[in-house]
Each structure stands twice: as C-alpha cells, then as structure tokens.
Amino acid sequence: DAGRRRLLQLAAWASCAGAARASSIPVQIGVDAEFGLKDSTSAQAIEIGLRIAIAEVNAAGGVLGGRPLELVVRDNRSMPARAIAHFNAFTAMPDLVAVFGGKFSPVMMDVVPIAHELRLPLMAVWSSADPIVDHGRHPNFVFRLALRDSLAMPKLLKTALLRGFGQVGLLLANTGWGRSNLAAAERHLKSAQRPRITGVAWHNWGEKSLLARYMSLSESGAKAIIVVGNDDDVALLVRELATLPEEQRLPLLCHQGITGGKFAALAGPALQQVDLSVLQTFSFFSAEPERRDRFMKSAAKVAGIQSIEQLEAPTGTAHAYDLLHLLAIAIHRAGSADRTAVRDALEHLPTHRGLIKTYQPAFTPERHEALGEQDLLMARYRADGVLVPA
C-alpha cells in the first residue's frame, strides 16, 4: 500500500544518505616529524610530497569509493617522547590508516615497538638506520622508501675508492644512526677489503668544534673523510676546514643527513672551498622528464612551487610523494581502511610507475625496502646552494 511504499522510499533514502556520508568521511594519514626544529627542511619537504600526492589521489576520486585522503600533521621536534605520545594519539583516530615519520633514525627506532604493539603501519621516508625495518618482529608494520645505511655506507666507501682514496676516516654521529653506519661499513669491508679505514671519530650533536676529531683522522693517514652527521654539525666542520691551508682540506663524502636542513646557508662561502659530495637517492635534475613535469604541474597547483630549485630537501619530497601513492593503491586493494589489511596489501602491490622509478613491486613479504643500491647517486652543492648530480 501507499504507506508501505513511503516507508520503503524513506528507508532507501536514509540508506543512500548514510552511504554518501560514509563515502565523504576522510581516510586519514598521519605525519609526525621535526617541524619545530630550528632550520629543519626535512619535515617540511616530507609534508609537501604528501600534500601533492594526496591532492592527486583526491582529484582522481579518492579511495574506497570516493573517500578523500586527509593529512593530520604533528610536530615531534625530534624528541622520541613526543613522537611516542603522538603515535598513541594517532592510533586512537578510527579513520587513520598509517603514520609517516621524519628524518631522525633514533626517534623512529623508539617508535617501532609501539607501531607493532598497536598494529599501525609506520612509513619511513627519510630515516635510514637498518633496525627501523630489520627489527625481527612479524608481521612487520614498517615500510621504507628511503636510503638505508647498509646501502649508504658501501656506496660511500666504493665512491671513495673509485676516486682513488684507498684510506678513509669515518666521522660519525654518536647515535644509533652513526652506529648503524659503522656496522654497515664493517660488514662491507669483510668482503671488499678496501678502502682501508684508518680511524673512527665520534661526535655529539651541537659540538662547538669538530676540528680536533678531523685532524685525528687526517693524522691517521686518511685521504678522505666519510661523514655521518646532520646539517649544523657538518656545516661547522666545513667552516673550520676552510680556515686550514688548502693542502690540509681532505675531501668529505657525506651521508644524506646534511640535506635535511639549511646546510648550504649554514656553511656559507666556505662550502665552495671544500671538496664535499653527498649521497642521494634521487635528483629532479636527472629525473625522467615526463614524470618530473607531471609532478611539477601538481607542485605548482598545491604548493606554489614553480621550479626544481625551490624544492629544499628534494629527496624527502620525492620519497613521501611516491610512498603516499603506493599507500593509496594498498588502501584500494585492501578494500577498507583496516590497518592490518592495508599492511598486508602493501606487501602485494602491483607494478607502479612512480616519480623516482618504476616499482616492480615496491615491497614483498620478505622485503620492506622500496629502494636499492642501483637508486643511489652522489650530488654536490652549486654556488647557489642547490643540490645537483655530481
């Protein structure tokens, strides 16, 4: 009868309205990084990459039948206690599926146990210490699209040897990151033998001078120094080296850590007086033009970025951009925002044509590292402070 038909119509309308509301509820992505740290560019670069990729995913219809992605930003100021508190808060957000971390390996290493206890995927797009991914927990909730120390240190050692430096010194940050790199160097040299490490010197963050440590390595017979440190510390070293006679300035081969801040500005004119190169996973200058142009078109729309030169800490942006797109594919394949289902889907992704490369696939159940040795390159700073392939 008419009354029953009316009830059915109302029920159908309510069902459609409920579905529409459900499809408009955002799927949230967390990012917790060192935004408030003085001179940081890494956290900001990661956020830009995420926002550009999210805008592209949403413009193409979002995920799960039209749900938009939404970024939730937190600032851990590079403090592990803040990062852990933020991770706990992220877990309580029912529509949040994954958290992207920042630059600092010691912070990420402290978050890893919490990520597994709470079963929330943790995405590494900068931090490079091996134990962030190699922690022995199963199933593994950490996925990395970034440099890894056990790839970084062999690349730096091989580069030194190719340049004719048969003896090198290691100047390392006195943290889990520095220790991860020493372990990687020792593993590599078990089979490679050369270059010979003449000495290892450790430095703490915020030292007033690194010259004594540098001189000890120079006096040990090193012909080049491999440096694992952050922007402010290495900038101090560069300024100190520039005061030495030219013949006492050894080449510096640096881990990517220096690129996550205002390194060129902190080093100043001294940078052009020191032979310094830095490890990278990607350069927009050598990227495939079609992929780069597509990215730059979105970057102009979303972030007002008009040129490659405006991208500070460019690898952070590229890593975050590609990993966000891979995460969106995983959400689609999982068919829900269930965190464990998304984690499982990340291990079974199809081939994806990203900005950095074509991932075939990015991850497997046995491999949670999206980048390999073939993706690494050395770069140098131009006089205007822009990083270009060496």
Predicted regions and their residues:
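Intrinsically disordered, low-complexity regions enriched in serine, threonine, proline
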Residues: 1-2, 18
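Extracytosolic ligand-binding ectodomains
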Residues: 3-10, 22-390
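Hydrophobic h-region of N-terminal signal peptides that target proteins for export
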Residues: 13-21
